[in-house]
Amino acid sequence: MLDLKFIRDNLELVRENIKNRGLKLELDLLISFDDERRKLITKIGELNALRNENANAMKDNIDDSSRHYLIEKGKALKAEIMDLEERLGYLTSRLLVEHKRIPNISAPDVPVGVSEDENVVLKVSGNIPKFDFKPKDHLEIGIHLDLFDFEKAREVSGNKFYYLKNEAVFLELAMINFAFSKLKAKGFDLFITPDVAREFIVDGIGFNPRGAESNIYKIEDTDKYLVGTAEITLGGYYYNTILDLKSPLKMAGLSHCFRKEAGAAGQFSKGLYRVHQFSKVEMFCFCRSEDSDRIHNEFLELEEEIFTELEIPYRVLNVCSSDLGAPAYKKYDIEAWMPGRGENGDYGEVTSTSNCTDYQSRRLKIRYKEDGQNKFVHMINGTAIASTRTLIAILENFQDAKGGVRIPKSLVKYTGFDYISPKN
């Protein structure tokens, strides 16, 4: 979250940022809570000073009448302090709720927009394949090649679940190994993270764990949630820690990701594109404030490198203000070309990377020492590989007229085969 002093000192900037993000928040309510809280803290301090004076006066050699008066005065002061502290506790909790709703300040070069249609294309890379046949979408390809089964998954688990089968199993594992090998060579520490996180960690990362708008699953009768991304478990790894940040601390984590995807429907959400469970390799970095823009750009370069080596055409987007998550200062999306998307093919999101500055670290109390002072770290996240959407892009871009699919050269050493043959 933002520093409260920063909010008070920059009210118009914060107000404009809220407007640009398409949010309706009661900033004045936050300030009124803080004003009253400050007054209460001052008043409680004054009353405690009076109570101490009263207690010291009772140590003097005084008559019974004066002692009785001081005792009653002490009781009255104690009762008043308790009442004010109860009010202070209530105000502090209300203040925290409103405070957490305030999004991060957006970077100066974030485009202002009201929908994802106003995301700005920064770069287009790769050659869109030209087929001498009508290309199939990944659903047709996968069913024909016996790579996944949605019907059985619907019976067993419900809508938006799937079984991966046969070569698709090797292909998913190959993508994960490919990403991990690349990130290990780039100096990342590798993790397989828990698929469950406590509520205060989920909340600290900036995911809203409660309410109808929540996109993650709560485990009943616990304070735990299934994670929607390893960003949650990697970001929480150093909760309440003071780090020795001689250099940026880079981590890469594999997790299953669970999403409710409530209300998601339509042709662009079919098949593997929007599902309740998938695997993802996530990149994460804890760094000093002066390094975060550079690391953010490095994460984008890594994502581009991955999709270039997978031979998948893509474009890079500078995400507009209303499409930013609350923690993000700036965000890039990569969209891969998917020939089976829509009538004539279209781009679909496959990765993103966000610089969240110190928004998450303030909630999670993750700091570093500099010149004898504790400062909040900056936190950057990014997708290396999201299994399902990358699988879509591979199946659709590398299909051939015979109904088979070529495997990208960079994955062959991990799959052990270079072609998925049509089934008779």
UniProtKB/Swiss-Prot annotation:
Primary residence: cytoplasm
Binding site for L-serine: T229, A230, E231, E282, T383
Record: residues binding ATP: R259, K260, E261, V275, E349, V350, T351, S352
GO molecular function list: ATP binding; serine-tRNA ligase activity
GO process terms (BP): selenocysteine biosynthetic process; seryl-tRNA aminoacylation
Swiss-Prot/TrEMBL keywords: Aminoacyl-tRNA synthetase, ATP-binding, Cytoplasm, Ligase, Nucleotide-binding, Protein biosynthesis
GO cellular component: cytoplasm
InterPro entries linked to this entry: aa-tRNA-synt_IIb, aa-tRNA-synth_II, aa-tRNA-synth_II/BPL/LPL, Ser-tRNA-ligase_type_1, Ser-tRNA-synth_1_N, SerRS_1_N_sf, SerRS_core, tRNA-bd_arm
Recorded metabolic or biological pathway in which this protein acts: Aminoacyl-tRNA biosynthesis; selenocysteinyl-tRNA(Sec) biosynthesis; L-seryl-tRNA(Sec) from L-serine and tRNA(Sec): step 1/1
Cellular localisation: Cytoplasm
Catalytic reactions on record: tRNA(Ser) + L-serine + ATP = L-seryl-tRNA(Ser) + AMP + diphosphate + H(+); tRNA(Sec) + L-serine + ATP = L-seryl-tRNA(Sec) + AMP + diphosphate + H(+)
EC assignment: 6.1.1.11
Comment on protein domains: Consists of two distinct domains, a catalytic core and a N-terminal extension that is involved in tRNA binding.
HAMAP family per UniProt: Ser_tRNA_synth_type1 (MF_00176)
Family note: Belongs to the class-II aminoacyl-tRNA synthetase family. Type-1 seryl-tRNA synthetase subfamily.
Function, as annotated: Catalyzes the attachment of serine to tRNA(Ser). Is also able to aminoacylate tRNA(Sec) with serine, to form the misacylated tRNA L-seryl-tRNA(Sec), which will be further converted into selenocysteinyl-tRNA(Sec).
Subunit structure: Homodimer. The tRNA molecule binds across the dimer.
Entry protein name: Serine--tRNA ligase
Provenance organism: Borrelia duttonii (strain Ly)
Phylogenetic lineage: Bacteria, Pseudomonadati, Spirochaetota, Spirochaetia, Spirochaetales
